[in-house]
């Protein structure tokens, strides 16, 4: 009797496990990225808002800024160093003016000139874009006109015609002086004939008839 060999088991479920592990890592990265992004405005924006809302002439103190940030829902105790860094950066940029104290400690006031520039960034960008587009259109028109002006003189160049016109005026110059030289000789020969005719014909005096005497 012949012995039957059992078939080898197929490895089907083995490659599926690492794929499942890779898929599980992607949502974890997305969750970490979502945690890193802070919700709401940044520290510098909150400081600017607090300084603009205050009505004190001498400026807002650091304690007053911290109170305003805490009221807005910002964790002041954990982010104390960030608040100080934000104040220093705003002072260096010119958005805040330090009226009292040095460094992060003291009182600060909002710079009106810097705030007006920051509130209108879109308008300045639109103005610069319109100026750039207008200048580019003018440059395109100028380049098109220059190309046309360069092409036109090529058609106007005709060296053969200019050479022919320069040769033609030489011929009449040689012919004209001969005719002028002949005409005065004829006029001089005619004048002495008229003088001879006047000399050869002297006028003779006719005798007057005597009147008859009356009886």
Curated annotation (Swiss-Prot):
Describe the family membership recorded for this protein in Swiss-Prot or TrEMBL.
Belongs to the histone H1/H5 family.
Residues bearing PTM N-acetylserine? 2
| Bias (Low complexity) | 122-147
Q: What broad taxonomic lineage does this protein's source fall under? A: Eukaryota, Metazoa, Chordata, Craniata, Vertebrata
Q: Name one Pfam family in it.
A: Linker_histone
Oligomeric and partner information = Interacts with DFFB.
Phosphoserine carried by residues: 2, 12, 44, 107
Limits of the H15 domain: 39-112
According to the UniProt record, list the residues that bear Phosphothreonine: 204
Question: Which InterPro entries does the UniProt record give?
Answer: H1/H5 (IPR005819), Histone_H1/H5_H15 (IPR005818), WH-like_DNA-bd_sf (IPR036388), WH_DNA-bd_sf (IPR036390)
| Modification after translation (UniProt) | H1 histones are progressively phosphorylated during the cell cycle, becoming maximally phosphorylated during late G2 phase and M phase, and being dephosphorylated sharply thereafter. Citrullination at Arg-57 (H1R54ci) by PADI4 takes place within the DNA-binding site of H1 and results in its displacement from chromatin and global chromatin decondensation, thereby promoting pluripotency and stem cell maintenance.
In the record, N6-(beta-hydroxybutyryl)lysine modifications are located at 37, 55, 67, 88, 93, 109
Asked if the Swiss-Prot or TrEMBL record annotates the protein with the keyword Nucleus, the reply is yes
Write down what this protein is called.
Histone H1.1
Annotated region (Disordered), positions in chain: 1-43, 94-215
Q: Name the source's superkingdom.
A: Eukaryota
Carrying N6-acetyllysine, the residues are 17, 78, 93, 125
User: What's the main place this protein lives?
Assistant: nucleus
Q: What does the record give as the function of this protein?
A: Histone H1 protein binds to linker DNA between nucleosomes forming the macromolecular structure known as the chromatin fiber. Histones H1 are necessary for the condensation of nucleosome chains into higher-order structured fibers. Also acts as a regulator of individual gene transcription through chromatin remodeling, nucleosome spacing and DNA methylation.
**UniProt domain comment:** The C-terminal domain is required for high-affinity binding to chromatin.
Q: Where in the cell is it found?
A: Nucleus; Chromosome
């Amino acid at each position: 009797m012949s012995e039957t060999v059992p078939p080898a088991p197929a490895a089907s479920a083995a490659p599926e496990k690492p794929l499942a592990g890779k898929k599980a890592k992607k949502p974890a990265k997305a969750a970490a990225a979502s945690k890193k992004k802070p919700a709401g405005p940044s520290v510098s924006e909150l400081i600017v808002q607090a300084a603009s809302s205050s009505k004190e002439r001498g400026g807002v103190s650091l304690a007053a800024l911290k109170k305003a940030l805490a009221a807005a829902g910002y964790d002041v105790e954990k982010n104390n160093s960030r608040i100080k860094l934000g104040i220093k950066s705003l002072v260096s940029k010119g958005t805040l003016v330090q009226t009292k104290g040095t460094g992060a400690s003291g009182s600060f006031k909002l710079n009106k000139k810097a705030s007006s520039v920051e509130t209108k960034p879109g308008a300045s960008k639109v103005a610069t874009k319109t100026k750039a587009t207008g200048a580019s259109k003018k440059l395109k028109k100028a380049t098109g006109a220059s190309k046309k002006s360069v092409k036109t003189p090529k058609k106007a160049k005709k060296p053969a015609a200019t050479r022919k016109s320069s040769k033609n005026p030489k011929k009449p110059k040689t012919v004209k002086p001969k005719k002028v030289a002949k005409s005065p000789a004829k006029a001089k020969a005619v004048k002495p004939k008229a003088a001879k005719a006047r000399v050869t014909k002297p006028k003779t005096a006719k005798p007057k008839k005597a009147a008859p005497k009356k009886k």
